[in-house]
Amino acid sequence: MAPVSLPPGFRFHPTDEELITYYLKRKINGLEIELEVIAEVDLYKCEPWDLPGKSLLPSKDQEWYFFSPRDRKYPNGSRTNRATKGGYWKATGKDRRVSWRDRAIGTKKTLVYYRGRAPHGIRTGWVMHEYRLDETECEPSAYGMQDAYALCRVFKKIVIEAKPRDQHRSYVHAMSNVSGNCSSSFDTCSDLEISSTTHQVQNTFQPRFGNERFNSNAISNEDWSQYYGSSYRPFPTPYKVNTEIECSMLQHNIYLPPLRVENSAFSDSDFFTSMTHNNDHGVFDDFTFAASNSNHNNSVGDQVIHVGNYDEQLITSNRHMNQTGYIKEQKIRSSLDNTDEDPGFHGNNTNDNIDIDDFLSFDIYNEDNVNQIEDNEDVNTNETLDSSGFEVVEEETRFNNQMLISTYQTTKILYHQVVPCHTLKVHVNPISHNVEERTLFIEEDKDSWLQRAEKITKTKLTLFSLMAQQYYKCLAIFF
């Protein structure tokens, strides 16, 4: 059958009800269709990209309509064979009922084409709507033939095809131009379903996020300013992208240029000045370690402190003391003219060896401890300054730095012995029996024969009652 051309300005856009009530119903019942615009093609023996060439109605709307005979998967079964040579059609969602004038006339099924074989197929943008006629719409002569044909609408959505798992995944980002045209890497348009207007292809690509890192030296602020305030984003909006593809894209790290860090101009002299200013207020009650910016890459000026056992001494030189500005501060004042003032120290500038026991002291800082430390510490002369020609006055400020070392105590675990319970049995001992017998024997001689017989009878009855009571008590305890 030759292709049919419509006059200019006409488009073939039938509704679901029109496709079923007119075209599909007339095809199954054997009635004549006025204009043959839908061809009969076995869709499950053709690939979807070959279907546009088999359509009788060429159109720029990228939608094609076909009558497809039903191909059963099994001879005795009702399942349809939807596998092609290069892939398969997979149903998505539930079948929707198509109604007309409050009565059901057919069903609509949505299918998506996958390349390869299940379950490792690759989803594509080819979508098919399969319409089937309800059995109530069949003529008596064509009863039971409602499943003989299906009317199919085939169109293509522009989506991002997922790569197989065994292949290397690389996502190319193509930036949209100002006019809002498509990008050539993914063929991504503003809408998932292609409209009547054709889109131009842009051949400009941006660097790949998956394989190439950004060069922070080559990227300036102007490169990133193009994204601010723009209505076009590097990626489509979330509701236009398939969920599966979006999740797979988020699994890859997108490397952005590092932030530019400006080093603050903080010199050693400023640090030492601030430390000296803080010393007057007694800040050195705790250990303070001075950090300099210039010694990060220069290991020559670093101070190495060897800490051994408690008997070893921690020795530092006066030169390093003045550089780091902690433990001790010495001020040397010189004068060319001799004065009558009595200097505190003459001639030699001394350096003290600080014992590590001073740092591991548990005593509270007070003046008595300072005097005791001054009496016990040894002073060794390591460097000598020539004092000929001027007098040297050294003001020495001492600080007692202490460290509190505490130990934690382990918890005690107490084990309790479990002893099984014991059963306690109680037996009632009738004490009144012996008392009454003794009373009876004492008064035997004083009473007559009748009285004695009466007393014996009462005694027997009393004994019998006591025995009965004891018997019932034992039964009660036993049960």
Curated annotation (Swiss-Prot):
Expressed in a few sieve element cells before enucleation and in phloem-pole pericycle cells. Keywords: DNA-binding, Nucleus, Transcription, Transcription regulation. It is found in: Nucleus. GO terms for cellular component: nucleus. GO terms for biological process: sieve element differentiation; sieve element enucleation. GO terms for molecular function: DNA-binding transcription factor activity; transcription cis-regulatory region binding. Residues 6-157 form the NAC domain. Gene3D superfamilies: NAC domain. InterPro entries: NAC-dom, NAC_dom_sf. Pfam families: NAM. Residues 105-163 bind DNA. Disruption phenotype: No visible phenotype, due to the redundancy with NAC086 (AC Q9FFI5). Nac045 and nac086 double mutants exhibit seedling lethality with defective development of the protophloem sieve element. Induction: Regulated by the transcription factor APL (AC Q9SAK5). Transcription factor directing sieve element enucleation and cytosol degradation. Not required for formation of lytic vacuoles. Regulates, with NAC086, the transcription of NEN1, NEN2, NEN3, NEN4, RTM1, RTM2, UBP16, PLDZETA, ABCB10 and At1g26450. The NAC domain includes a DNA binding domain and a dimerization domain. This is NAC domain-containing protein 45.
